[in-house]
Amino acid sequence: MGKNILFFGPNGSGKGTQGAIVQKKYDIPHIESGAIFREHIGGGTELGLKAKEYIERGDLVPDEITIPMMVSRLQKDDCKKGWILDGFPRSKVQAITLAETLAKEGMALDYVIEIVLDRDIAKERIMGRRLCVNDNNHPNHIAFEAIKPVEKDGKLVCRVCGGDLKTRPDDQDVNAINKRHGIYYDEETGTMAAVNYFKNANGPKVISIDGSASIGEVTELIMKEL
C-alpha cells in the first residue's frame, strides 16, 4: 500500500535529501516544488516566467501561480499509489487548499514530517549545496561526506551520475536566504502556519524530527515512524 507523505522544513534542513531517500524506498514520486518551478521556468511556460520574478527576489511565489502547478502534478497517474510533497504548502491558505483538493480527489494525507533545524545551521547548509544538472533528486553538498561531490578532471561532479554541478544564485545570497527563512518561520502567514494547521487537523500523523543529526540518523528516525 502506498504512502502519502508531506515534508516540512526550512531551506537547508535536508528535507529534499530525505524525500529522495523515502522516494527510493517506497518507489513513489518525490514532488518537490522548487524542481517544478525550475522545470516551468526552464520550459518558458507562462506560470514559470511569472514564478521566476518572485524566486529571484527571494519572495514567496503567489498562490495563484503555485497551486495550479502543484495540483496538476498531484493529479498525474504516477501519484495514485502514493507521493511525497516537499516544499508545498507554504502557507495556511495553501494547506487548506491542499486538504480540500485531496478530499475532492479521494486521497488521504498519511504523514506530515517536520524537520526542525536552527536557522544559522540551515543557512550554512544552503550555501554548501550543489545541484546536479541532470537530476534534482541527486543531492550533493560540499560539507557532507555522505553526499559529497566527487572530483573528476579537476572539478567536482555529481556523486550519483557524474553530471555537472551548479549553484542556485539565491543559495549564495545571504539576504535572500534570510528572507526565505523569515517566510518559513512566520507563524501567522508563513510556512509554520501551514505546519500548525496540520498539527491541529484530524487525520495525518505529524512527526517532528531533529534536523541537526546526521543524514543517516535523520533517515533512521523517519523510517521508524513510517
Swiss-Prot record:
Pathway: Purine metabolism; AMP biosynthesis via salvage pathway; AMP from ADP: step 1/1. AMP binds at S33, R38, D59, L60, V61, G87, F88, P89, R90, Q94, R168, R180. It is an enzyme of class 2 (transferase). Keywords: ATP-binding, Cytoplasm, Kinase, Nucleotide biosynthesis, Nucleotide-binding, Transferase. It catalyses: AMP + ATP = 2 ADP. Its main location: cytoplasm. GO terms for biological process: AMP salvage. The keyword Transferase applies. It is found in: Cytoplasm. PANTHER family: NUCLEOTIDE KINASE. This is Adenylate kinase. It comes from Desulfotalea psychrophila (strain LSv54 / DSM 12343).
